[in-house]
């Protein structure tokens, strides 16, 4: 489930230090700055700027203290700034512009770019942006603007496609487009989850998932 930008960023970190995690630590610091800035902008939608400055570090601290980030350097941690800023764009629109104004093409394109980055880091985290675009599409449909909804989806998909361009060129030049698809999409969707092979039945899958969610919530009460 690990995408190209994840390897690219870790490759840059490796250039800083071949034998330590100094480069990865620097990468995490840079990402944390974007996390903090995004959290602050979200809070500013609801509270005074000074209050947002005080609360933002606390929110980030609680997030990093989560069991999900226990080991550090996970794909989810790399995705976090893109998810936070995507959340900010949607909250800003629905809090300050909807229903009087349609979401601008610039914001839709930005949302697509963020989704494209997540798709090339860990595509299974795209569920957030699927819901994001569905909400925007429904905001157009609520105004009976079907053409606007289609146009908005097109702009979003255009933005989402842009982060793929460097990798399409790279793998095409190396004659490895199919290998890219097979390793990143096919294996993760069909082989990794064992959907096509013999495995546990539906009831056992539900039981296992419920047990996992129980222990995750028990270790981190924030999930409640």
Where are these regions (language model features)?
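Alpha-helical transmembrane segments at the extracellular/periplasmic loop-to-helix junctions
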Residues: 80, 160-164, 204-224
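Short acidic/glycine- and proline-prone juxtamembrane loop motifs at membrane-interface regions
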Residues: 69-78
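Perimembrane helix-loop-helix junctions
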Residues: 128-164, 168
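Short hydrophobic/aromatic helix or loop-helix immediately within or flanking a transmembrane segment
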Residues: 1-22, 29
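Membrane-lumen/periplasm interface segments of specific transmembrane helices
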Residues: 152-197
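Membrane-interface transmembrane helices that cradle and orient dolichyl/undecaprenyl
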Residues: 44, 86-110, 140-143, 215, ...
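Transmembrane-helix signature of polytopic, membrane-embedded enzymes
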Residues: 34-62, 80-81, 98-106
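Membrane-interface alpha helices of multi-pass inner-membrane proteins
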Residues: 104-123, 129-135, 158, 162
């Amino acid at each position: 489930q690990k995408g190209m930008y994840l390897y690219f960023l870790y490759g840059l970190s490796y250039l800083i230090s071949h034998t330590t995690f100094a480069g990865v630590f620097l990468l995490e610091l840079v990402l944390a700055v974007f996390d903090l800035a995004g959290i602050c902008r979200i809070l500013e939608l609801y509270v005074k700027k000074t209050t947002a400055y005080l609360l933002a570090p606390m929110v980030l601290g609680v997030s990093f203290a989560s069991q999900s980030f226990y080991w550090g350097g996970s794909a989810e941690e790399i995705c976090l700034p893109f998810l936070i800023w995507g959340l900010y764009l949607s909250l800003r629109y629905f809090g300050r512009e909807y229903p009087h104004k349609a979401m601008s093409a610039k914001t839709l394109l930005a949302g697509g770019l963020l989704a494209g980055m997540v798709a090339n880091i860990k595509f299974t985290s795209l569920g957030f942006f699927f819901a994001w675009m569905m909400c925007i599409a429904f905001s157009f449909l609520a105004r009976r603007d079907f053409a606007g909804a289609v146009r908005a989806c097109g702009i979003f998909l255009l933005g989402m496609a842009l982060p793929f361009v460097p990798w399409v060129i790279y793998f095409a030049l190396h004659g490895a487009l199919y290998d890219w698809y097979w390793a990143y999409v096919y294996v993760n969707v069909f082989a990794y989850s064992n959907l096509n092979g013999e495995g546990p039945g539906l009831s056992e899958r539900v039981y296992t998932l419920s047990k996992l969610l129980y222990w995750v919530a028990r270790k981190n009460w924030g999930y409640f």
